[in-house]
């Protein structure tokens, strides 16, 4: 019966159902909540399919790098690394991402240009950020636009990872392609020219349009509890989409997500602490490339 389903979902402690369980606890048992719950479960399934589309399984031939400042790189080294961080990457919370459109691109596509998860623009912006942690990589190695944007204005370094050594540890890395969305007056698109790494860009576009239709049905209910649950479910993929103007980056991301405060959370030292987690695997670096404007390069 529906009552049994309600009791079962409320009692289920699976982390994947946290958002739906919280919604049911908030609104209680009624015909409307069962309908919303079914649609939220359908959205969850669609989100999981999209995440699988974007998943990267690196091979020994995979060449990915990330650009950083020399100071940040130094914190990975034994003489400066915090306890337990030797040879590991710091994966920062999305609150510190330098692109103001992070998480917005997919929202605009799904909700006809609106950004519902940031609240009413007439009121103060909600400063709370989800427990989503991102590390960005690219196959664009020693590439000038990447140096200027992410390599401390070409004064930093480009770290090329050795995936053959990482793979020998047989640990699952939550690595995803970024999907680049283009748009016209009427709709959004997943174009092959911007997404050469996707196995089926057409299938991805179809999944996104199905997701948009599902989200629209719930968004029109104008229900705060429903919107919160939908936001929590969509967080799994919100930060895996960017505007097609960034397609030259060919970005790949490690993405860790947590439903709440977790013992894995760390804070940087200093006056203004920043929230991060460590990769659950040690990183093997194949090559360190110094930027074209690296100070004292000849030394």
Pin down the residues of each PLM region.
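Partner-binding and oligomerization surfaces adjacent to conserved cores of proteins
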Residues: 2-299
